[in-house]
């Protein structure tokens, strides 16, 4: 917390899932995904990664956009405006990768010598309605760096609002 009205939130998250026993791959529900309201907010849910894999964003494509390794970093500045309304400005970075090289996910395998080139960057603004016992978040994220193969990587240099933005509505309820 900076003062009564302003604060900075920082989050680093990561994980690795390794199949064991007679499994060659993690079950679908245990695999990581990236993009969405609690991830890299410049992408819609399950549309980022793995690695430099460039999915076609079709309805069935989300199955291929999951991985075994996840790394994400979020930095957010929050300020109280009035009543219960807060403004947030954020920067997100991260991606997912696979442990093995899969034919259906070209460019998705984690490689120590190049993974840093596949870390996506996003930025944006959000409005929060803080009702103490729950929070409503409305975030608009924009892609800054898109690691997908065949893309203009620095999206911030040639923004296309429809292609490079994502809107997220979230209800945060403490348990």
Question: What are the functions of these language-model segments?
Answer:
Residues 1-4, 79-83, 130-133, 175:
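Outer-membrane beta-barrel strand-turn architecture
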Residues 68-72, 120-124, 164-168:
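Transmembrane beta-barrel architecture of outer-membrane proteins
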Residues 93-110, 133, 141-157, 173-175:
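C-terminal beta-signal and adjacent terminal beta-strands/loops
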């Amino acid at each position: 917390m900076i003062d009564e009205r302003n604060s900075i939130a920082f989050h680093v998250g990561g994980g690795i899932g390794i199949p064991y026993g007679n499994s060659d791959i993690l079950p679908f529900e245990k695999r990581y995904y990236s993009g969405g309201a609690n991830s890299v907010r410049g992408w819609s849910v399950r549309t980022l990664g793995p690695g430099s894999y460039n999915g076609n964003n079709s309805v069935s494509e989300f199955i291929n956009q999951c991985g075994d390794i996840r790394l994400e970093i979020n930095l957010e500045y929050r300020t109280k405006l009035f009543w219960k309304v807060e403004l947030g400005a954020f920067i997100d970075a991260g991606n997912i990768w696979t442990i093995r090289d899969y034919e259906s996910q070209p460019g998705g395998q984690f490689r120590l010598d190049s993974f840093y080139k596949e870390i996506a960057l996003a930025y944006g603004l959000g409005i929060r309605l803080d009702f103490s016992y729950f929070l409503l978040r409305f975030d608009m994220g924009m892609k800054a760096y898109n690691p997908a193969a065949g893309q203009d990587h620095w999206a911030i240099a040639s923004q296309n609002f429809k292609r490079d933005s994502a809107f997220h509505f979230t209800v945060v309820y403490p348990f």
